[in-house]
Amino acid sequence: GLKYVHNDTCYPALLVIGQFLDALNSGKYDLDHTALLITQTGGGCRASNYIHLLRKALVKAGYPQIPVASLNFSGLEKDSGFQMTLPLARRALACIFYGDMLCALRNQVAPYENEKGAADRMVDLWVERLGRVLLAGKGFTAREMKHTFPLIAKDFAAIPVTRVPKVKVGVVGEIYVKYSPLGNNDLQKFLESQDCEVNFPGLMGFVQYCIFNMGEDHVLYGGKLAVKMGTDQLLNWLDSVERAMLKATADAGFYAPGPFKELVEKPRGIISLGAKMGEGWLLTAEMIELVQG
């Protein structure tokens, strides 16, 4: 990344663009039949400009023929070659819910499991099972997710464990660095090697945060009422699914954080909900949630 992107550019951009270039340099791909896809938040964060930095880096690296498509919900890069459809968006949301639940349960079981690797094997089992279901065009409706959540929780609860006191460490931060072992120097592996239980707040919280901010902009600055109504309706649907996931988690004897609608209330009086560059008020909210939880 540093070879083709200015070093003053934010850390995640250097890593993400570096990963793209590393893949192209690997020799594993037919470069005349390869395209890149990168997300754009559409907010004030420089992440909205990663796509332009990536295109410049490709030219400098000798890959001007490789197109870059944008994945965003803000109307940016409308002609980039990739369009998010409603069916695809519903599947993506389902994958995020399932992924959050698997990660949360795995992290609460792995430090205490009697048989090393049992929690990771259970994750692999459910990833394979859910993959088959989703590829068959099923498993992504609210009804299907609400049916599946208790089954996942039940399987993890059945893993034999020995509960002993351990240090619990919550991790918050910039969205890429928080989850990427490359970005955070494999923080989770290190903490687990120190006999800690690690808690990473889920990705769905960030998704809801982005949606909420679109509606909050209407409250703070005006604009189209339809946007506010649309985001409220979408958040209500996500809240319904999220509460079912959290209930299944708690019913199986695991720790479940509060839903997003409760998370929004936690930073009030500490930081404005209009502070939304990067992860903004979400960082404060997640820290409060982890401390109180």
Regions found by a protein language model. Name each.
Residues 1-293:
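An N-terminal assembly and electron-transfer interface module characteristic of large anaerobic redox
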